[in-house]
């Protein structure tokens, strides 16, 4: 925690001409997806009552409350730290940029979570994740349509392999793999759009502000969104114990504060297509950790999917031909 808070103290909202470093970008994205993999394993245990305290199982935590609390708690933790170290004046944003970051928090972070959980409720985890990980295709299409990138064979291959690998890793080829439901499928597609949006919009806003400012206002706007969807009295009515709230505090750090700070840092060093292909490591880590920690089986088809995702990441990070576009921002560390 000390080193994490120390990095906040050294951040500055002023642009510094730091050269983008792709290796650091991939390391940041990998760290973020690893944390999300841990969060997925913890979340699964929380949903099913698999959390233990002093040898006793804690009562299951509602997925909606788990998603809501992690953004709200993250904002409440981050705000006083930044306020104390930077002062209120350095936390203010122009109205236009404030609006953009609010949209990033609501349409990107909060909406992707909301539609993802709605899709799980209406279909299953495999269907939700498989459709959500069509987001790399959406990002590539957007970047090409706007003229930011060319549709090279390298990019198309990497995006295609990332999608196929994620589908196999999640278990689309297994029993109960893909389940159709109009509302559930629609929600999963909207989750993919939201995921793609916060990769592209996040990359753009990080050209002007450091990751901590972006994280502060995205968690704020996402928290407000969740308060509308799930009002405070519903939280009170859940009657969670002190141990459950302690878990929610830890979960906020593992699922939002740490991984989003890493992911936003990665977006400062990588253009959105490469970043979102690398993000396909998340289901890989989730599956491996679930196998190691929860005893879930890892089938050969899932192992093949993991290998394909890794191949996609290797392909997307290969150097482009001379004259390729440069769409990374100058990192504000």
Model-predicted regions and their roles:
Residues 46, 66, 70, 119, ...:
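Hydrophobic/aromatic residues within transmembrane alpha-helices
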Residues 23-31, 35, 60-84, 100-103, ...:
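Hydrophobic alpha-helical transmembrane segments of multi-pass integral membrane proteins
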Residues 78, 82, 142, 151-173, ...:
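Hydrophobic transmembrane alpha-helices of multi-pass small-molecule transport proteins
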Residues 37, 41, 72, 105-110, ...:
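Hydrophobic/small/kink-forming positions within alpha-helical transmembrane segments
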Residues 1-65, 177-204, 329-333:
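Glycine-/small-residue-enriched transmembrane alpha-helix faces in small-molecule transporters
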Residues 69, 109, 113, 128-134, ...:
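Helix-helix packing/entry segments at the starts of transmembrane helices
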Residues 83-126, 168, 252-270:
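Specific transmembrane alpha-helical segments of multi-pass solute transporters/efflux pumps
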Residues 41-58, 89-91, 121, 170-181, ...:
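Membrane-interface helix termini and inter-helical loops of multi-pass transporters
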